[in-house]
């Protein structure tokens, strides 16, 4: 995980519900990668500054961004936060 992700996680750690949902999604990612994420969470590839990374909605305005390395069966956690926090213009 990136330094930014660690900071983002610290910000939501005071909200038990968001933290629990985030931990559940991390478990899905660890187990099955993007294939483990339910369609209702809208997993998709990103363009722009996060080109090549993937994103899904933990809540309507709580997103997680990660990169997936299929050869090594690894993921790299990049960011966690709201649309406005992650996609500032």
Task: Name each region found by the language model.
Residues 65-66:
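Acidic, metal-associated active-site segment
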């Amino acid at each position: 995980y990136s330094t930014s992700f660690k900071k983002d996680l610290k910000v939501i750690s005071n909200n038990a519900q968001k933290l629990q949902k985030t931990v559940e999604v991390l478990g899905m990612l660890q187990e099955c990668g993007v294939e483990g994420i339910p369609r209702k969470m809208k997993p998709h590839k990103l363009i722009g500054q996060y080109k090549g990374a993937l994103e899904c909605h933990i809540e309507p305005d709580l997103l997680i961004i990660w990169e997936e390395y299929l050869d090594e069966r690894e993921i790299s956690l990049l960011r966690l936060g709201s649309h406005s926090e992650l996609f500032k213009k």
